[in-house]
Amino acid sequence: MEKQYLTVTALTRYIKTKIEYDPHLQSVWLKGEISNFKNHSRGHMYFTLKDENARIAAVMFAGHNRNIKFKPENGMKVLVKGKISVYEASGSYQIYIQDMQPDGVGNLHLAYEQLKVRLEEEGLFSQVYKKAIPPYAKTIGVITSPTGAAIRDIITTIKRRYPIGNVIVFPVLVQGESAAPSIVQAIRTANEMGEIDVLIVGRGGGSIEELWAFNEEMVARAIFKSEIPIISAVGHETDFTIADFVADLRAPTPTAAAELAAPNIIELQEKVLQRTLRLQRAMRELVHKKEEKLQVLQKSYAFRYPRQVYEQKEEQLDRALEQLVLAKERYIDKKVNQLKQLSFYLEKHHPSQKIMQTKVAVETLQKQLQREMQTLLQTKEFAFVRAAQKLEALSPLKVMMRGYGLVYDEEKQVLKSVKDVSLGDAVSVQLQDGILDCSVSGIEERELNDGK
């Protein structure tokens, strides 16, 4: 019987079919620890689920993971629901997860803690960014559900405390999937209006699921970016939402938020009354002091004898004018003297005087130079004449004029001894007026006696 060989693809598909048709593997509840977690740019999640003895590859596509509130991380223990299948390309089986919950802690609670830590690290909770609530807001915006006790409590409290204030309500959804985008849009709209002084954002109490819109990241960032100060009023005395941490001020209830946003008109009236009384008292004291000062002035010499005071002041003015005239004349005399001194100095140090002095000095130096040049020239001429006379006395031509001559050999070398020639050598004799060509016909040596 001939053997039938399967391809790897055929075998893998067979195994995949077997697994996918097994009802026990199409709805699997599994718990384990996440490792090798990767969040793909398209939104899919890839990771490994493991326990002490085994591991399995896991995939959670974007269509399913967008519903989870927390952020999966390595080391996190989770409870998952999914189905088992085979990834043909690698031949490995894996679980395709449809739902995932944290193991041991609630899904929403974990998501809350993760977002709280992340936003706090970014600085969204810092007091540095908190805006002051205006003490006398003219227009108060309220972002909440248009129905329910919260909006009634807020409006009733504001109108009771501050009836002259304006209230603008921005109706929104406060729970459900559409609640967070609705709240974000209302915050943006209030900021764009440009007339809201303070915003109250909140709702009545409820469970964590009902309050979850106020734990959404988009709501937290919208509150942080708001130019209008925001008071959060979610309605839980003890529990805090993410919105409470980001808001500029947190109120435990909607009624408390209204009291923080709107001043008490009775207290304002009391303040106005107290300040009016203080102002009146201060004005009375000021008028009293001015009256006393006026009485003192009325009793003064100037008020009682104004003509004498006028004459005294007129006399003082005349003296002051005389002193001013004298001072002016002294000042002018002083400046005239200074001008004369400057003129004398300039005349003394005028450039023409300096030029004349320099010209005389140059002429004197020129005459001195001429005398010294003449003396030097005469000295040089005298030295030259003496040197010429000395040279003339030593000149061979001078000796020749006395009958002497110079004898040269054929190579034009001066002969100094009879030993320098031989019989028959040609020699030349230079006299003062010419040269004789001769031939040696005889040689007679003589002894020198003291050079003679």
Curated annotation (Swiss-Prot):
UniProt KW Hydrolase keyword: yes
- Give the matching Pfam families: Exonuc_VII_L, tRNA_anti_2
Query: Origin, by domain of life?
Result: Bacteria
Reaction(s) catalysed (UniProt annotation): Exonucleolytic cleavage in either 5'- to 3'- or 3'- to 5'-direction to yield nucleoside 5'-phosphates
- Major location category of this protein: cytoplasm
In its UniProt record, which GO terms are filed under biological process?
DNA catabolic process
The subcellular localization recorded is: Cytoplasm
Can you name a GO cellular component term? exodeoxyribonuclease VII complex
Q: Which UniProt keywords apply?
A: Cytoplasm, Exonuclease, Hydrolase, Nuclease
Q: What GO molecular function annotations does the UniProt record carry, in alphabetical order? A: exodeoxyribonuclease VII activity; nucleic acid binding
Give disulfide pairs as residue numbers. none
Q: EC number(s) in its UniProt entry?
A: 3.1.11.6
The main enzyme category here is hydrolase
Q: Which family is this protein grouped under? A: Belongs to the XseA family.
Q: Which HAMAP family match?
A: Exonuc_7_L (MF_00378)
What the protein does comes down to: Bidirectionally degrades single-stranded DNA into large acid-insoluble oligonucleotides, which are then degraded further into small acid-soluble oligonucleotides.
Q: What quaternary arrangement does the UniProt entry report?
A: Heterooligomer composed of large and small subunits.
UniProt-recorded name of the protein: Exodeoxyribonuclease 7 large subunit
| Species name | Bacillus cereus (strain B4264)
Q: Which gene is transcribed and translated to give this protein?
A: xseA
